[in-house]
Curated annotation (Swiss-Prot):
UniProt keyword Zinc-finger present: no
Protein name as it appears in the record: NADH-ubiquinone oxidoreductase chain 4L
Similarity comment: Belongs to the complex I subunit 4L family.
Transmembrane segments: 2-22, 29-49, 61-81
Gene name as annotated: MT-ND4L
Keywords: Electron transport, Membrane, Mitochondrion, Mitochondrion inner membrane, NAD, Respiratory chain, Translocase, Transmembrane, Transmembrane helix, Transport, Ubiquinone
GO molecular-function terms, A-Z: NADH dehydrogenase (ubiquinone) activity
One GO CC term on file: mitochondrial inner membrane
Membrane topology, from the record: Multi-pass membrane protein
Stored PANTHER family: NADH-UBIQUINONE OXIDOREDUCTASE CHAIN 4L, NADH-UBIQUINONE OXIDOREDUCTASE SUBUNIT ND4L
Summary of the function given for this chain in its UniProt record: Core subunit of the mitochondrial membrane respiratory chain NADH dehydrogenase (Complex I) which catalyzes electron transfer from NADH through the respiratory chain, using ubiquinone as an electron acceptor. Part of the enzyme membrane arm which is embedded in the lipid bilayer and involved in proton translocation.
């Protein structure tokens, strides 16, 4: 495995670990999810280019589109929660609270 692939997998693992550690704040979770999506995009692009997979050239672009949609929905949720509660804690999103 080349050092580039190792660094990208390490970036994904770090972002995933950050999602697990900072799961109480919505903004931190969104940033870690974006880091995961960026590392997946770069990894899939490098794999497709190295293996000359001409059939799946559009897969990284599709992944990037889904990442943009996820970011837009996440930011809309962040704005809604911060306007409603004044905080970005995920525990405020519990539907079982009265």
């Amino acid at each position: 495995m080349t050092p580039i692939f190792t660094n990208i997998i390490l970036a994904f693992a770090t972002a995933f670990l950050g999602t697990l550690i900072f799961r109480s704040h919505l903004m931190s979770s969104l940033l870690c999810l974006e880091g995961m999506m960026l590392s997946l995009f770069i990894l899939s692009t490098l794999i497709i280019l190295n293996m000359h997979l001409t059939v799946s050239f559009m897969m990284p672009i599709l992944l990037l589109v889904f990442a943009a949609c996820e970011a837009a929905i996440g930011l809309a949720l962040l704005v809604m929660v911060s306007n409603t509660y004044g905080l970005d804690y995920i525990k405020n999103l519990n539907l079982l609270q009265c």
